[in-house]
């Protein structure tokens, strides 16, 4: 099997990139792509850049040219769930846009035209991530992750997310675009993010301070889940 992994920022992919064996590197449309093996698993790791457009472009490149069997989105996120702390893991059950508004045409807030309201992560992948997180003794929450082209640091933007998506556990800037592309390619996906801040007025300071911690945590989860993923995938195919 082949696993696709996508992260927005250099800090979010560096730890995994450093461990790829027989690594081949190329650049396409501003995306850095690294292919090789993590342990015995064939992987393609892509750094897309920040935001929904960059994420959608990178995901399309990854799925079209490398054709991974599944896709994992890694990186950092801002926590919305009250019990989440820096370094805790959030796992997507579903992903939605928080900044899309075509409600004038009868769609839900956050629903892109001609798309479902939410994009649902693969249940088997969620189970594998939960097993891995438990083995690593990390605190994790699974639930709705919201995405939009804004860094959330309190005020009206945060209030709007809490109003329309009261069950959201985290917010970030790429996952929904990645999920939409996976939906259109019919590729199973899961989002694994570690908390770097809590979306308040000081979130930009927290993000800068704790980004590397969040990146390390999410990368560790992915690295440890790959053997379980390979074994499980082989057993069901």
Swiss-Prot record:
InterPro entries annotated for this entry? MTA_SAH_Nsdase, Nucleoside_phosphorylase_d, Nucleoside_phosphorylase_sf
Entry-linked Pfam families: PNP_UDP_1
List, from the UniProt record, the residues annotated as the active site of this protein.
12, 197
Keyword set includes rRNA-binding: no
Q: What class of enzyme is it?
A: hydrolase
Q: Which UniProt keywords apply?
A: Amino-acid biosynthesis, Hydrolase, Methionine biosynthesis
Known EC number(s)? 3.2.2.9
Q: Please list the reactions this protein catalyses.
A: S-adenosyl-L-homocysteine + H2O = S-(5-deoxy-D-ribos-5-yl)-L-homocysteine + adenine; S-methyl-5'-thioadenosine + H2O = 5-(methylsulfanyl)-D-ribose + adenine; 5'-deoxyadenosine + H2O = 5-deoxy-D-ribose + adenine
Say if the entry is tagged with keyword Hydrolase. Answer: yes
Q: Which GO terms describe its molecular function?
A: adenosylhomocysteine nucleosidase activity; methylthioadenosine nucleosidase activity
NCBIfam families from the xrefs?
MTA_SAH-Nsdase, PRK05584.1
**HAMAP family named in the record:** Salvage_MtnN
So what does this one do?
A: Catalyzes the irreversible cleavage of the glycosidic bond in both 5'-methylthioadenosine (MTA) and S-adenosylhomocysteine (SAH/AdoHcy) to adenine and the corresponding thioribose, 5'-methylthioribose and S-ribosylhomocysteine, respectively. Also cleaves 5'-deoxyadenosine, a toxic by-product of radical S-adenosylmethionine (SAM) enzymes, into 5-deoxyribose and adenine. Thus, is required for in vivo function of the radical SAM enzymes biotin synthase and lipoic acid synthase, that are inhibited by 5'-deoxyadenosine accumulation.
Q: Which PANTHER family match?
A: 5'-METHYLTHIOADENOSINE/S-ADENOSYLHOMOCYSTEINE NUCLEOSIDASE (PTHR46832), 5'-METHYLTHIOADENOSINE_S-ADENOSYLHOMOCYSTEINE NUCLEOSIDASE (PTHR46832:SF1)
Q: What is this protein called?
A: 5'-methylthioadenosine/S-adenosylhomocysteine nucleosidase
What is the species of this protein?
Hamiltonella defensa subsp. Acyrthosiphon pisum (strain 5AT)
